[in-house]
Amino acid sequence: MIFKNAYVYDEKQSFIKKALFTHESSIVNKEQHSSCDHIFDLADHWLIPGLCDIHLHGAVGGDFSDADPACVKKILRYEAQEGISNVCAATMTLPEEQIKKIMRIISDYKVSDDEASLAGIYMEGPFIAASKCGAQDPAYIKDPDLNFLKRCNELSGHKIKFVTVAPEIATACDFIKEASKQMRVCIAHTNCNYEQAAEAFRHGAMQLTHAFNAMPAFLSRSPGPLAAGFDYAAAAELICDGVHLHEATVRSAFKLFGLDQILMISDSMRACGLGDGEYTLGGQKVKVSGPKALLCEGSGNGTIAGSVTSLFSAMRHAVLHMRIPLSEAITAAAVNPRKALGIYPKYGILNQGSEASFTICGKWLDIKAVILRGRIIWGEEFLKEHLIRRNVACS
């Protein structure tokens, strides 16, 4: 396929108006593309690489923690239609056997053509602090346990890419030193001070899980893990749904940590893509009203319980309502997460040799069509309207 007259996000992390050529599942150059069946004139639309959500729990009624292949399928299908082509399945603080079951399900799951790819697992919990457990169930919190982590990683087929730890726990630094040899260790669900966080970063931690949330605030005389993250060049995950973070906080984070260290995430739960109502997250009841998901019982009453926003919608919100430049938002949602996973530039850029997964958007970042691994999975009617030639030579 050829897509003409579109603004394409390129290897310089900026937009250029040009034609994009695809063959099978890859992006190719004109010389490699000897013929094609379809040429589309996209008339100044935007071509954005498929996003990469490294931290989501669920969507459209499913949760990865359900350990149910049917739930995995509908989550991945929804994510693909939302312009997200790679995801990491996030777990919760749950009973050990349930966590192991999740690992086995993810290890065995085979992705279909219309589903986002599983790039790994984000193990959020159970190695967290009860004082900052948020929507995690404190009943199943564990001290950092390297043997348990190794067993989970084996069961997952070595798919664990991220693990969250609270640095103030006595055994945390020894755990971080060993775990960081195999995956990225992240800090959150913690009440640690600056010094404890700095020690964790010196031992190998390199990321802040949903920065600013479930951790101490950045105060003048007690700067906490956020300042330590800045001092040790850690990456910072941001949930840009308009609920978790004030828009000024997001803009400040981009400046404080630097664009290359910002990772946009959704942290979405099973209500994402659905409506208001009562749901569950990690076995706890959650009430969703509009853009907010809040715990509705127990000591965590009123605590934010993940988001109900896809990563693409969060990126759009950051651009349209938080004044983050589009090119920077895409870098934070498509490029940086894949660099963290070590799969860039095969994924996350619209350049020769990269995977042909991208979203066609209108002026206001409304999704018009989605191409996943070279196949049209959404927006066929839109593309039919923009089909100008078929069965022609590409000379």
Indicate residue ranges for each PLM-predicted region.
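Active-site gating loops and adjacent loop-to-helix segments of metal-dependent hydrolytic enzymes
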Residues: 77-88, 130-157, 199-212, 222-235, ...
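Conserved, mostly hydrophobic/aromatic
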Residues: 123, 179, 208, 318, ...
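Active-site core of metal-dependent hydrolases
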Residues: 150, 154-276
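C-terminal cap of metal-dependent C-N hydrolases
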Residues: 6, 339, 349-395
